[in-house]
Amino acid sequence: MTHQVSVLHQDKKFDVSLRPKGLKEFCGQAQLTERLELFLNAAIQRGEVPGHCLFFGPPGLGKTSLAHIVANTVGKGLLVASGPQLVKPSDLLGLLTSLQEGDVFFIDEIHRMGKVAEEYLYSAMEDYKIDITIDSGPGARSVSVDLAPFSLVGATTRSGMLSEPLRARFSFTGRVAYYSDEDLATILRRSSNLLGIDADASALYEIARRSRGTPRLANNLLRWVRDFAQMREGNCINSDVAEKALAMLLIDEWGLNEIDIKLLTTIMNYYQGGPVGIKTLSVAVGEDVRTLEDVYEPFLILKGLLKKTSRGRMVTQLAYNHLKRCSDNLQSLGEEK
């Protein structure tokens, strides 16, 4: 089996250029970063390898960046793997034995590891040992192999799917939450400086408030607005230009996109506002269940537009009000033209 394993310098140039190198550069998540800084520095001061860390939260909020920061803080190497690729012990063997003392082993989507591989990881995390089976058949024997002490960093969008034995082996657990518009605007200012984009503060705030509290999306939208301004507005990036660019992507003032609106209007128009089951909704809007649950629902629930009940999903009165207001705005714009 071929592992998609990478180290820091193999990331895409764009992502690396924007990725914060240390906790001082990491904007937002103040309580989490304060605890993490204390946790790491205490271990460094004692001359120990930091304990294992677990970060959980919606996609795009900086869990991978935090893994890189852990490695940068302890000054060691970073090895990256993806949970779905770790199915059996042999998938882990080469990775674990390649680690040097103090290295950080980052497993993204750790909740999707195979059960057998996960159990194989227990002794590696707790005792820095693994058992290797030599030969096969009647002559097979198990040999215990010592590993170099390392720090495992796991990231998951679904912490509830982690088994209790695995969760209990993490010394540090941190929830990465959605960002405020102000924090996103600060992140975008840093990104625009790094990328050489000349944008005024009002434009950055306009992008921030439509970015669903997610830095990854904010940076992607910043690039889109840059491209739009380059081709349509003579490289001028102000709030009006940002609004035009984001309207072209069908992103409204709350950050709702075409799929969000389709999801809400489907429940309203075809299921009388709900409740409707997630599988039925998946077929109706043409998105798989996992994408709806991980990408779209958390933000809609956070904004108070959707609620989950024991019988299914329901839209709220706020959703009706918001979509009516958007419709009225579009109609008035059409009349002005």
From Swiss-Prot:
Its main location: cytoplasm. ATP binds at L18, R19, G60, K63, T64, S65, E126, D127, Y128, R169, Y179, R216. Residues 180-250 are annotated as: Small ATPAse domain (RuvB-S). Mg(2+) binds at T64. GO terms for cellular component: cytoplasm; Holliday junction resolvase complex. It is found in: Cytoplasm. It holds the Pfam family RuvB_C. Keywords: ATP-binding, Cytoplasm, DNA damage, DNA recombination, DNA repair, DNA-binding, Hydrolase, Nucleotide-binding. One of its GO terms (biological process) is DNA recombination. Its EC number is 3.6.4.-. DNA binds at K308, R313. The keyword Transferase does not apply. GO terms for molecular function: ATP binding; ATP hydrolysis activity; four-way junction DNA binding; four-way junction helicase activity. Gene3D superfamilies: 1.10.8.60, P-loop containing nucleotide triphosphate hydrolases, Winged helix-like DNA-binding domain superfamily/Winged helix DNA-binding domain. It catalyses: ATP + H2O = ADP + phosphate + H(+). The keyword Nucleotide-binding applies. Has 3 domains, the large (RuvB-L) and small ATPase (RuvB-S) domains and the C-terminal head (RuvB-H) domain. The head domain binds DNA, while the ATPase domains jointly bind ATP, ADP or are empty depending on the state of the subunit in the translocation cycle. During a single DNA translocation step the structure of each domain remains the same, but their relative positions change. The RuvA-RuvB-RuvC complex processes Holliday junction (HJ) DNA during genetic recombination and DNA repair, while the RuvA-RuvB complex plays an important role in the rescue of blocked DNA replication forks via replication fork reversal (RFR). RuvA specifically binds to HJ cruciform DNA, conferring on it an open structure. The RuvB hexamer acts as an ATP-dependent pump, pulling dsDNA into and through the RuvAB complex. RuvB forms 2 homohexamers on either side of HJ DNA bound by 1 or 2 RuvA tetramers; 4 subunits per hexamer contact DNA at a time. Homohexamer. Forms an RuvA(8)-RuvB(12)-Holliday junction (HJ) complex. HJ DNA is sandwiched between 2 RuvA tetramers; dsDNA enters through RuvA and exits via RuvB. An RuvB hexamer assembles on each DNA strand where it exits the tetramer. Each RuvB hexamer is contacted by two RuvA subunits (via domain III) on 2 adjacent RuvB subunits; this complex drives branch migration. In the full resolvosome a probable DNA-RuvA(4)-RuvB(12)-RuvC(2) complex forms which resolves the HJ. This is Holliday junction branch migration complex subunit RuvB. The lineage of its organism: Bacteria, Pseudomonadati, Chlamydiota, Chlamydiia, Chlamydiales.
